[in-house]
Amino acid sequence: MGLKATARKNAIHAMVVYTEGCNGCDIEVLNALLSPRYDLEQYRVLLTWNPREADVLIVSGCVPWQMVEPLKKIYEMIPEPKAVLAVGSCAVNGNVFTNMVGDIGINEEVVGPVEKVIPVDVKVPGCAPRPEDIIAGAVRGVPKLMEA
């Protein structure tokens, strides 16, 4: 077994994609992944920016039209088995970006939640969700990774 295969087998590699929003969820995702308080590296959860090395795709924010194709390409580049986490209310249901009412009307700049673009395995609601909730959501996605 080569070095790359060994590393992939013995760790979970998470890739984070920020689509559109206030960045509150992005901060909490990074707190969950990189903060010494949670220290996920001790559990072999590592951050990657290469979709070919990722096992878990973490998406935050409502998806604008400009991100549809890039998000699909990233998803397709991640090898099986893979899990997708939609983190935050914007990623889960579109939140204020798609649910505008009154004089403002419907926002035509956004597609909506992540599941309208790619399949989502775990939804972590909240504005912004706590790092503990993000970690719990990631744990719920682990069984799918173990299927292969």
Predicted features along the sequence, with ranges:
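Iron-sulfur-associated redox domains of electron-transfer enzymes in respiratory
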Residues: 1-148
